Amino acid sequence: MAGPASVAGDVFVDALPYFDQGYDATGVREAAAALVEEETRRYRPTKNYLSYLPTPDFSAFETEIMRNEFERLAARQPMELLSMKRYELPAPSSGQKNDMTAWQDCVNNSMAQLEHQAVRIENLELMAQYGTNAWKMSNDNLALMIENSQKELQNVRKEIQDLNWQRKNDQLAGGAKLRELESNWVSLVSKNYEIERAIVQLENEVAQMKQQQGDENKENIRQDF
């Protein structure tokens, strides 16, 4: 249950869930849900609250390759197989057997393929030499990150628990104070009722005494005459 909002926009909550009773009573949850539903029906938005924003452009970050791939998927076409042509070493065709340029292109292609394989071998050797330690260091870094995250998580959980305990203590103290004030209010109301009843009784007695005195005065006057 929330009170009125302040100037700063904060909402003052006057519910004491750690102290209040009756939340689990039959029909309470249904009644609360009915109140929420009734309020949402009365305050449904009457216009598009995003109307001040421009129309979203979902293709703003699409590239030509992405668009082609989307079109392929929409057409349910299979993906093109990976071309292995650049790894082939074809000899010049029968019509180019005497063409030096064709043979030079074949030699250049062979040299490129050889260099590519040499680079692959170097990478494998480097991985064999340093890969194990690099992998161990990466695992150690991940373990350290996990440990730090676990510590941070424990700290956050402790802060949440401390906050909940503080909230519970404050609510129980506030509830006890409210109960004391309620008891004092009931006592004061009872005393006021007793005082009012005594006043009414005294007023009745005074009225009776006045009436009796008036009757006696009338009787004395009548006897004098």
Swiss-Prot record:
Signal peptide: none annotated. Keywords: Coiled coil, mRNA processing, mRNA splicing, Nucleus, Spliceosome. One of its GO terms (biological process) is mRNA splicing, via spliceosome. It is found in: Nucleus. Pfam families: BCAS2. The keyword Protein transport does not apply. Transmembrane segments: none annotated. The keyword Transcription does not apply. One of its GO terms (cellular component) is Prp19 complex. Residues 138-222 form a coiled coil. Component of the pre-catalytic and catalytic spliceosome complexes. Component of the postcatalytic spliceosome P complex. PANTHER family: BCAS2 PROTEIN (PTHR13296), PRE-MRNA-SPLICING FACTOR SPF27 (PTHR13296:SF0). Required for pre-mRNA splicing as component of the activated spliceosome. May have a scaffolding role in the spliceosome assembly as it contacts all other components of the core complex. Belongs to the SPF27 family. This is Pre-mRNA-splicing factor SPF27. It comes from Danio rerio (Zebrafish). The lineage of its organism: Eukaryota, Metazoa, Chordata, Craniata, Vertebrata. The gene is bcas2.
